[in-house]
Amino acid sequence: AMGAYLDNPSIAQGIANNFGLTPAQFRDFGIVNLYPGALGPISTTPIVSVRGDRNIVEVEQSQMRFVAGIGGDIPFMNFGSVEDWSFDAYISYSLSEGKSTRYGVREDRLEYALGYYSTTSTPCENDVGASLRSDATAGCVPVNMYAPSLYPVGEVVGDFGSAAERNYLFDSRNFDTEYEQIVASAYVTGDILELPAGEVALGLGVEVRFDDISSDPDAVAAEGLFWGFFSDKGAQGDRQVNEIFAEIEIPLLANVPLATELNVNLSGRITDDEYYGTNTTESVKIGWRPVEPLLIRGTWGTAFRAPNLRELFLAGSTGFTNVADPCYVPDGALDQLTGAYVPENDNRDPQILANCAATGVDPRLANNNGFNTFSVEVQQGGSLELDPEESESWTVGFAYEQDFSNKFDLSLGMTYYEIDITNTVIEPSTGFIISDCYTDEAGTGASVFCGRITRDLSDPTNPQIVFMDLGFINRDQEVARGVDYNVFFRDTINVGVPLDFSANLTASKLLERSTEFTNPDGSVDRETYQGEWGFPEWQAQLALRLTWDRWTATWETRFLDSVDSDVENIDPFDSIAGLSDTCFGPPNDVLCRDYAKADDYFLHSTSLFYDADSWTIGAGVRNVFDKEPPVVDGSEVLSYSNTPIGYGYDLQGRTFFFDVVYRMGGS
């Protein structure tokens, strides 16, 4: 079969194009014999898809919520400048329940039925002393993985050769989850003092929250007994949070020179968490109107978020995923005939090689013939050792509404913001862990994420990753800075009939989006993301609207700035003789290389609506010019069929819509 494959004219010509000779010429000239000859009996692995295996899920969900409250005035608190006091109190109870059942093939039963636990490969026999569950051995039926029914002609999905085999192998995976919450809250509000600029208003409140989660898997789910399916040990835990809060609004100045209005708002909250003790958050807001059309505003505040129940109590969920290992010799650095390592063809960054070596892997010996993506067991889980998230933020900006003409409306606004979050709770992905560990510029393998990678180092030529910990972890610091802009204009245009025209432009400039991790050796890993996927430096949206009588026509344009992947994660080029991620698509493409750049992106939509007293009818077109999303390398960007997903690009193309709305009881 291999000889016939190599003699196929197209295959032979392809090899000749790459290496100068056909397989037959390599053999006849005495260079190398690529023809294996008769191999005799060889072992094979059946690859089948079984009807109903892990793809049918039965789900039951129910939810109920009860709320009881009372509110009213407090007349006995009206004395002097203390007046207009009122109260509001409520208690709520919520219960959410879910039950799921999935059917599939038990891996332990399949192995037992195929003789994996027998020294003579006898089905349904265990003479090696393996510890097997009683429900795995009871009723065992030998299974024929080469039954014709598993390979139906013209179909992808087959079935086992007998009902007895199917009944023995199949089991159910059951999961019951219950989430319960009780909230009791009360607050009072009123005026406490009269100043020359107005009344000072005060609000006081208290809130108690109780949360409980009970997520119970059966043994099949908890132990991951389905073939090729993850385990999930569920979650058990509860938490109580008590809070008191206060807010005061103080009008400092009003109707004086350079201060038509000057207000200050102060608020604070004390939170007592069962697991994280007592914490405080504060907020200050200032609004100053030097002249009536102009408002200058600023805010400062802190925030606190304790880890939620899942982040605290998730008992552990395991599974398998494909992981690209940069410590293995890439295909482009291998001799295409002998498979030997060629150092001068190795284009990996020096810090990758250094970090691999620092973590116990020789990146010049680890060799899997260029196939460096492996299936790796991963585990997610919660932790009571997580720190709470804390943040500090401040903003400053202005809003201006013109008052020099009553013929048109014009408003301008701008806000600068800066948010600094410490101890952000994240659930790192395999790609994030690999990248942070092996692209660390220090090259010492000191990244905090290197400890989440477990390898089998018994064979230096094959130090495979066998386990990765994806459990929740605190990120030391996360910073976001930027500027938001908005412009609104409205005027009436007379073209025989009055047309109301408006334009609304909003835009955002991202100045910084960065993260920091402190490694065990004290060094700091800092990553910046502005201009990369998911964080374009500029975003904007323009809405043009024209209204006449009951008709409204709209044109909307959305803009996303160009983005690119982190340069540290992009290989400059790849071997044309090896497997390449892209050899087409990039503008002016001359190299086979990783490519994950998107140019400026504009998306246009339009609509026309008629609004009657009790009904509305309209139609429109989304993505008027049928703008396609960018094409990217799927190994660099989250994508499907080389199309980025989750980044704001339209995936549907030009679409038409028609809406009819009827309002019961009139307008």
Each predicted region: which residue ranges?
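Transmembrane beta-strands of outer-membrane beta-barrel pores
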Residues: I74, I91-K99, I192, V206-S214, ...
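Gram-negative outer-membrane beta-barrel transporters
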Residues: D409-N569, D659-R663
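Residues that define the transmembrane beta-barrel architecture of outer-membrane proteins
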Residues: E60-F66, E180-I182, G198, D238-I244, ...
